[in-house]
Swiss-Prot record:
GO biological process, one term: symbiont-mediated activation of host autophagy
Keywords tagged on the record: Activation of host autophagy by virus, Disulfide bond, Glycoprotein, Host membrane, Host-virus interaction, Late protein, Membrane, Transmembrane, Transmembrane helix, Virion
The protein, known as: Inner membrane protein E199L
GO cellular component terms listed in the entry, alphabetical order: host cell membrane; membrane; virion membrane
Superkingdom per UniProt: Viruses
Topology term for the membrane: Single-pass membrane protein
Coiled coil feature spans: none
Function according to Swiss-Prot or TrEMBL: Essential for viral fusion with host endosomal membrane and core release. Not required for virus morphogenesis and egress. Induces complete autophagy through the interaction with and down-regulation of host PYCR2.
Cellular localization per UniProt: Virion membrane; Host membrane
Transmembrane intervals: 150-170
Induction cue: Expressed in the late phase of the viral replicative cycle.
Residues with attached carbohydrate: N131
Changes after translation: Contains intramolecular disulfide bonds.
């Protein structure tokens, strides 16, 4: 069964890799080197050469750059934009047929996964609202929804706004706790702050 990708976007986080792709026997016949790399990956013996054989959409080379395989089970680790896919994304972490790169192997063998991530072995639903796809991934894991904030630091403007809002809240709390006896200490209204920011 062919898995034609819905997009060929590098690091697309809204892909569930539910399509199993060509059967193992087909893969063995058509792509014997790739199958051998996957077998080595199962026992943590993959090499940099295997990484090149498997490739990815982002690399624009190898098995996982081909439309037929790009969003198949074999490519769930290398083509997923999910942060820490090897740690907490079931189609990658919970699938022995998903090739893990040497870098992903090292993260797992050295136990470098962040604490607090839930590894979902069965995902009932994977997806989310496209307009917040840069910020959130929602995993429905046995009816428990775990939301991970991802890629925030890749959006400096959003990070700056969050920091400004936090500082304003802290300043307000501090000025209100001091009794507000001095009118000079009062924070100007937010509309004035933002109008002053526009002057820069």
């Amino acid at each position: 069964m062919s898995c034609m990708p819905v997009s060929t976007k590098c690091n697309d986080i809204w892909v569930d890799f539910s399509c199993t792709g060509p059967s193992i026997s087909e893969l063995q016949k058509k792509e014997p080197k790739a199958w051998a790399a996957i077998v080595r990956s199962r026992t943590n013996q993959q090499t940099a050469e295997d990484d090149n054989i498997i490739g990815s959409i982002c690399d624009k080379q190898g098995l996982c750059s081909k439309d037929e395989y790009a969003y198949s089970q074999y490519c769930a680790c290398v083509n997923s934009g999910t942060l820490w896919a090897e740690c907490a994304f079931a189609p990658c972490n919970g699938n022995k047929n998903a090739y893990k790169t040497t870098e992903q192997r090292n993260i797992l063998t050295n136990k470098q996964c962040p604490s607090g991530l839930t590894i979902c072995q069965n995902i009932a639903e994977y997806g989310g609202s496209g307009n917040i796809s840069d910020l959130y991934q929602n995993f429905n894991c046995n009816s428990v929804i775990n939301t991970f904030l991802i890629n925030v630091m890749n959006h400096p403007f959003l990070t700056l706004i969050l920091i400004i809002l936090i500082l304003i809240i802290i300043y307000r709390l501090m000025s209100s706790s001091s009794g507000g006896k001095h009118n000079d200490d009062k924070l100007p209204p937010p509309s004035l702050i933002f109008s002053n920011l526009n002057n820069f």
